[in-house]
């Protein structure tokens, strides 16, 4: 756990760097289409380091996450057989993807909204939206709502309770790391066996 605590402390320091917002933009964009690390990892320490800019950071996450989601949609729509399938295979979701199609045709908008808000791998949904031909305009609108809710909720909580949350994270870092890991593995497990 010392390794993870060191990463957390390092991230808090980098969050104060003058170029931190560009890293946040890049991670937000990439995570929505192919990158495995969510932008929350950088958003949280950045908002803790500069409470006054928390809502601005949420805006960055929302905009670039939706733009990355459009790339994910394009990968699914235009390049699923040449690129998208490898991303799905990387996460071992081949079987789930075909079963998922039936649910997606009926509940696509709700699925995009849910994935936008939760820790569910959003890139899986952005690619699926393209593969299954979800209306691109609805996809963008629902992505803005879902991703905006997620990132602004985090930013608002950190704005109002930042120091308390930071103390809580510092005190229970090891437990929170384990819980986060269990949730991450659990969500991948659920996706795989839907």
Question: Over which residues does each language-model region extend?
Answer:
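Membrane-interfacial helix-loop-helix
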Residues: 1-26, 49-118, 144-194
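Structural signal for alpha-helical transmembrane segments and their flanking helix-loop junctions
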Residues: 44-49, 118-144, 156, 161
